[in-house]
């Protein structure tokens, strides 16, 4: 009796997914398609048996960002399954972000067999090349069809791919060719599910392998800093593994206690509010020139550089001895080009430094770095009170006021995702200690607006009730993310800043346009009512007109367990003027009230 090729396809697909599950992959996001039918049937079978969690999505781009959010929050590999053709191209935006942000993500894409390639066959494209430039690793089944794969090759393919996605976290692409017939009949499905197998495929349960970190670090001399001389610590977005964050925080506390150095941290750095030496409003310090008197200083940079232009300008000036430490990422992460890079992780570096630091009197650091830190904290406290008076005095909602007030209205345990463009910049400048009261997430790899809502949904699957702060265009760009609201495990409060388009462009130094309309070619406001759109998706929503309304809306949103939308209307032109005035007035106020440090 001839066994249908469809049965072989289904069996191999089931074995592949079982092997991934055994490795530790729990979440699978499935997109519709015919060529991927065997994978869909296999995923559904394992989901019914509670062996994996299956989420479905009609939009591959949205699906990939949902999986990205799951990976970002859990630190574990999540998987996206798609059919062939342009479906694979839609994975690229999330793959780019996963690569730059170091999140483990696995793409399983079904493909046409070799006989249908390069001959004009429908939906037969060079999809195997679509994601290669940003993936940690690429692998594929036999080009003639996955039914020809051996047990040893399947085990190797899955093992290597999982390892490459996990070690230095990032995206991995596995392309799987399927020969027809694709869809097994009910008899073939039952046979496979009842234990039928291909000769050579072992039946014992696959055991997860312990993933060892692959180190390609060169044996270079340990780059050192003098803890008893003037220094400063600059933290960019966290790019290490989730499970390494606590040891990173411990090493930071240890190094700061030893040195007394001040800490300038990005909201996405993972630093906690109880960290000694933390300067909350450091971005404003640079905008008003408070650091200009510091000519020579050691700079310990942890991770990618924060987006502050003023900070980057300051770092480019002479007198900065810079050491950049990354969490296993050996790629060049220094756009300034003035640092020595150490890629074995901050905890490792601190341990090695402590072994070779000579004991010196504590008075040294008090004279040098602690003086600087105390001065910065003094300025920080002054700015903190000054901003409260300026931003809350009339009850009007502005984007800076929203960034400052919102963290105070949220429970400390509630995570926040902050969208790119104006929201993350205002959070950096105006949120103060609120930026470090909770874990913050965002796109700081490629800094795009692709998939903002979908990633927030994915984060919520792992983190539970949480908040997304986004602009109107970023939300509109990913409205398919609302389709995930059917998932009862997602509980997202979306606070949308409606400033009539791309308000960030009002903050850029764009000269007067000779021909064309600034609003049309940059701001691009859309004639869409987000509240009507929310209603169409079955969401609950509220409109906020003043700061008092915001507090009531937040209380209302936490009384619910479903996804909700809170619309906050602002004026991007007026808010730009406010930011400029705040900087100018603060500089003048400081010169009148505080003496400058040397």
From Swiss-Prot:
Any one biological process term the GO annotation gives: phylloquinone biosynthetic process
Pathway: Quinol/quinone metabolism; 1,4-dihydroxy-2-naphthoate biosynthesis; 1,4-dihydroxy-2-naphthoate from chorismate: step 2/7; Cofactor biosynthesis; phylloquinone biosynthesis
Listed EC numbers: 2.2.1.9
Keyword Transferase listed: yes
Keyword Translocase set for record: no
Pfam family, one: TPP_enzyme_N
CDD domains the record matches: TPP_PYR_MenD, TPP_SHCHC_synthase
Keywords from the UniProt entry: Magnesium, Manganese, Metal-binding, Thiamine pyrophosphate, Transferase
GO terms of molecular function: 2-succinyl-5-enolpyruvyl-6-hydroxy-3-cyclohexene-1-carboxylic-acid synthase activity; magnesium ion binding; manganese ion binding; thiamine pyrophosphate binding
Cofactor: Mg(2+); Mn(2+); thiamine diphosphate
Cofactor: how bound: Binds 1 thiamine pyrophosphate per subunit.
InterPro entries linked: MenaQ_synth_MenD (IPR004433), THDP-binding (IPR029061), Thiamin_PyroP_enz_TPP-bd_dom (IPR012001), TPP_enzyme_TPP-bd (IPR011766)
Catalyzed reactions per annotation: isochorismate + 2-oxoglutarate + H(+) = 5-enolpyruvoyl-6-hydroxy-2-succinyl-cyclohex-3-ene-1-carboxylate + CO2
HAMAP family: MenD
Subunit composition and interactions: Homodimer.
Assigned protein family: Belongs to the TPP enzyme family. MenD subfamily.
NCBIfam families: menD (TIGR00173)
Function: Catalyzes the thiamine diphosphate-dependent decarboxylation of 2-oxoglutarate and the subsequent addition of the resulting succinic semialdehyde-thiamine pyrophosphate anion to isochorismate to yield 2-succinyl-5-enolpyruvyl-6-hydroxy-3-cyclohexene-1-carboxylate (SEPHCHC).
Protein's UniProt name: 2-succinyl-5-enolpyruvyl-6-hydroxy-3-cyclohexene-1-carboxylate synthase
């Amino acid at each position: 009796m001839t066994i249908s090729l469809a049965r072989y396809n289904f069996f191999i697909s089931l074995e592949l997914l079982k092997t991934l599950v055994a490795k530790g992959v729990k979440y699978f996001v499935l997109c519709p398609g015919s060529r991927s039918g065997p994978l869909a049937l296999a995923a559904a079978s394992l989901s019914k048996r509670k062996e994996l969690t299956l989420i479905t999505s009609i939009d591959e781009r949205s699906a990939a960002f949902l999986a990205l959010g799951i990976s970002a929050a859990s630190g574990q590999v999540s998987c996206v399954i798609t059919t062939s053709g342009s479906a694979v191209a839609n994975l690229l935006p999330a793959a780019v972000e996963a690569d730059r942000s170091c999140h483990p993500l696995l793409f399983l894409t079904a493909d046409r067999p070799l006989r249908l390639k390069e001959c004009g066959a429908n939906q037969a494209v060079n999809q195997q090349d679509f994601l290669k430039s940003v993936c940690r690793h690429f692998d594929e089944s036999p080009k003639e069809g996955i039914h020809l794969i051996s047990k040893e090759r399947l085990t190797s393919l899955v093992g290597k791919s999982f390892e490459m996605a996990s070690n230095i976290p990032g995206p991995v692409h596995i392309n799987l060719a399927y020969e027809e017939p694709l869809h097994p009949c009910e008899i073939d499905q039952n046979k496979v599910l009842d234990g039928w197998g291909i000769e050579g495929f072992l039946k014992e349960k696959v055991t997860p392998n312990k993933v060892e970190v692959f180190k390609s670090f060169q044996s270079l001399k340990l780059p050192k800093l003098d803890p008893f001389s003037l220094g400063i610590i600059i933290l960019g977005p966290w790019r290490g593994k989730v499970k390494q964050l606590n040891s990173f925080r411990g090493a930071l506390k240890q190094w700061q206690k030893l040195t007394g150095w001040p800490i300038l941290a990005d909201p996405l750095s993972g630093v906690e509010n109880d960290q000694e030496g933390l300067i909350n409003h450091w971005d404003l310090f640079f905008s008003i020139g408070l650091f200009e008197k510091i000519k020579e200083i050691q700079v310990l940079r942890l991770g990618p550089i924060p987006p502050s232009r003023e900070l980057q300008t300051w770092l480019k000036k002479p007198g900065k001895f810079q050491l950049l430490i990354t969490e296993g990422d050996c790629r060049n992460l220094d756009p300034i080009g003035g640092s020595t890079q150490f890629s074995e992780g901050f905890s490792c570096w601190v341990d090695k430094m402590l072994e070779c630091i000579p004991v010196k009197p504590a008075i040294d650091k008090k004279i040098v770095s602690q003086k600087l830190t105390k001065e910065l904290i003094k300025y920080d406290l002054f700015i903190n009170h000054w901003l409260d008076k300026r931003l809350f005095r009339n009850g009007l909602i502005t984007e800076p006021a929203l960034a400052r007030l919102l963290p105070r209205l949220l429970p400390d345990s509630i995570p926040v995702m902050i969208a790119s463009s104006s929201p993350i910049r205002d959070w950096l400048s105006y949120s103060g200690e609120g930026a470090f009261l909770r874990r913050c997430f965002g796109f700081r790899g490629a800094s795009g607006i692709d998939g903002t809502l979908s990633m927030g949904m994915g984060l919520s699957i792992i983190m539970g009730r949480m908040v997304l702060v986004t602009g109107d265009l970023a939300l509109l760009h990913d409205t398919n993310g609302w389709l995930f609201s059917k998932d009862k495990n997602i509980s997202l409060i979306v606070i949308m800043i409606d400033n009539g388009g791309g308000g960030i462009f009002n903050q850029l130094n764009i000269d007067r346009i000779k021909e064309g309309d600034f609003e049309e070619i940059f701001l691009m406001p859309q004639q869409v009512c987000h509240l009507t759109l929310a209603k169409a998706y079955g969401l609950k929503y509220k409109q906020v007109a003043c700061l008092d309304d915001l507090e009531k809306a937040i209380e209302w949103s936490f009384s619910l367990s479903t996804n909700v939308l809170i619309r906050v209307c602002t004026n991007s032109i007026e808010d730009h003027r406010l930011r400029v005035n705040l900087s100018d007035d603060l500089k003048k106020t400081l010169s009148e009230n505080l003496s400058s440090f040397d």
